[in-house]
Structure formats: structure tokens, C-alpha cells
Amino acid sequence: MSFVSKLGAFVRGLATATESKFPHKAIPPTYTLATLRAFPSLEPHAVFPVHNAFLNAPIRRDVLWLAVVMELDNRRVGASNPPGRSDHKFSRHKLLPQKGTGRARVGDANSPIRHRGAYALARTAPNDFSTDLPEKVYDMAYRIALSSAYKAGKLFVVGEHEAAGSELLPGDSFDLELTHSHPRALDTFVTKHGLGKLNVLFIPGEYDPEANLAKAVSKYGDKVRMLRKEDVEVRDLLKADRLVVSKDALVYFAAKYTRHIL
């Protein structure tokens, strides 16, 4: 019997022994459940299954770090244009004689070691500081960021289930939108859910700058934001204390960031 055959028989024996020791072993679930809510009350109405690979990924801080560093690198403009020694304004003459002073040898006033001297490694704009990351690694970071928000109870999905026939509260809808344009409608939402000191991120399925919610969010600055689903980065997901996402946007994220594994 060859070595490969012996190895195969050994592995099969281990599998059989494991099955006999754990006769009632269970297969882990493939899906987790996300709650569908109405807006702005966030009243739950139904649940729908989401694959574990998307919303139940194990937390990997090293992968999140790689994604955030790449995003910040790519945001750098690279417009700095510091003067080098040849561009600086001072004379090229030595500040002191080479010998006879009892002091260390010095060059001209453009030396980088001098106060108000030139830059040793000057660059000429535009400078490209962008870095790259494998697509599969970035997709993993995105899934980890969403899974972290889901496990921490920070993710709220707004939408309607096809089979559910729940009744809505007055002023509610299954769309991520305010039903009226009252100037304090969003203030009521923030106060009711205790979000005054938290960062809130809204991600609609289709961004409309003329929508009531988009206009209301624009008055809040950086504390309450709304982004197009195509513009959301890993940093945005990690910075938000509450993620209010439409079901269409969540389906879009699932299709985009699990295409290499499902």
C-alpha cells in the first residue's frame, strides 16, 4: 500500500472516530436573521435571512486596519511643495570657515539641520500617496465592519418583507424617508432614540438630495450624515454609532462584497 493510500485510510479513520465521539453534533447555521423596521419609529415588523459570511463574519482588527489605512492614503491630495536645498533662498556660502574655529564643520544656511533650512527630501507636487489593497481583502474588511455593527446592535435595517402584512404607526413608512417636511421632524427622531451625542449614518437605497430626510440631515453637520451607498467606506461604517440602512442598500452591499466567496 502506498503512502498516499495509508494517509487516506488514516484520515478516514479519524473522521469515523470523531463521528462516534460526537453522535449528536450539529451543523452550524448558514444564515443569521436581520430585523426589518419601519422609519422613523424603528418599530420591528419582520425578519429576513442574511448569509453568515456577510453579517456574521469574525472580527479581524488587522484587516480593518489595512482597509482604513488604504482609504486614508487615497484621500491625500499630495499638493505639498516644500522647498529643497536648490530652491531655498539662502546663500550657498559656508556659514563658518572649514578650520580654525574649534567648532564642527558646517555647510550653508540651506542645510536641513538649520533652523529655517530646506527640506532634505523635498517633493514636487503633485505627489501620489495612494496605496492599493487586494479586492478580496477589502471586501472582507467591509463585511467585518458591517458584522461588527450588527453584533453590537448598531445596525438598523429599514424595509418591508414581501410576506409580512404589518400595520404601520402614524407617520411611519417602510422607506428610509421622512413622511413630511417639518423642520423638526429629524430632531424628534434624534431625541426619541437618544442619538443626540452619537454619530448617525443613513444609507438609502437611492439617494435623492431633494428628499425630506436629506434636507434635514444637511443641518446637522458631521454628527448626522447621509451617504450614497456607492460612496460608503469602511471608515464610515466604523465611525458611526448607529447605522440606519435601507433594505435595498443592504442587498446591494451583500451582492457586491460577497461575490468572491458565495
Predicted regions and their residues:
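Residue-level signal for pocket-adjacent positions within structured domains
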Residues: 45, 50, 83, 90, ...
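A short, flexible low-complexity segment enriched in Lys/Arg and Gly/Pro that occurs
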Residues: 59-98
